[in-house]
Structures are given as C-alpha cells and as structure tokens.
Amino acid sequence: MKTEAIPINNGRNFPSRGKGLTFMLPRSPLKLLLTLTLTLTLFSPARAEDPKPLKPTPKDKCPVCGMFVAKYPDWLAQVIFKDGSHAHFDGAKDIFKYLFNLKKYNPSKKAEDIQAIYVTDYYDLSPINGREAFFVIGSDIYGPMGRELIPFQKEADARGFMKDHKGKILLKFKEVTPEIIRGLD
C-alpha cells in the first residue's frame, strides 16, 4: 500500500519540533475511507449499556400465557423497552411468541422500541442477553409451559446439555422462527 506523508502544520516548521507533526495516509480514496472508518470505530465512545434486568414482582404476569412469572425464577425471560417499560415471561418460548406477534400482545410497541432481551441461563440461572444466547430444543427437560427452548450463554454448555438431555437442535436467537415455536406447543 502506497502512503504519503502529509504535514499537519501546513508545511511550516516549528522551532521546537523540527519539521512538525506528520502522519502517513493511504493515497487511494477507498483505503483512506477504510482507515478513517476503522479509526472512528475503534475510538468512538461505546454505545449505552443495556439496562440491567429487573426482578419480577409477585403480581407480574406473562403477557402471553397469563402465568405469574415470579413463581418460575429458573425460567424468567424479559423484554425491556427504550422508554423503560418491560414485560416478564415464564420462559423463552413465550418471549418468542411475544416478539413474533408484538402487535397482538403490545400494540403500542414496535420491535425498534426494544432495548434489551433477557433469558435465564439454564446452568447458572443468571440473566443473559437473549440476542446472544444459544437455545436447545427437543430435550427431555420441560419448562413451566411444557416443551421449551433451553437457553445458554455458552455454546459449549448448550452442546453438553444436548448430549446429557437428548437435545435435538441448537439455535441462535435469529434462527428461531414462528414455525419452530408452534412446533413446541
């Protein structure tokens, strides 16, 4: 890659700095654009963190099935909207039903309004980012609403679970479809 030294002092020499400050830029406009994009990406402030998951109260109900979710802490799932409102679920299956038919369950919201999605990791029982989770279906483990997507933060844990509990399919968040969810009912 050919580069060219470009002085940033308009070619004037500063007595204390010799020839002034210079840096190397690529000559090609495309390479220059890529260099600038990479630099801006690396040094831009990070986006705002997702809000922390909220604990359900004894009165919080799943908007899909109507169950009181606090009774099932090992299966909790949650959607948090940008305006601070939220919904709790008694498992990953119901959160997907909700997301696939948001107009039915929460007509005032759109997918773009969602700030965070949480599911509960099956092994360590902690809330994890649902969009980054691995889900196992077809296992011998059932959730509060029967057959369930079993969430994991780590792919290795999901694969180990599949071996131990006869799991059939491992999916990422974006691979879950309405047809798969209907097949679990």
Q: What is each stretch, according to the model?
A:
Residues 31-41:
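Bacterial N-terminal signal peptides
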Residues 50-108:
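N-terminal secretory signal peptides
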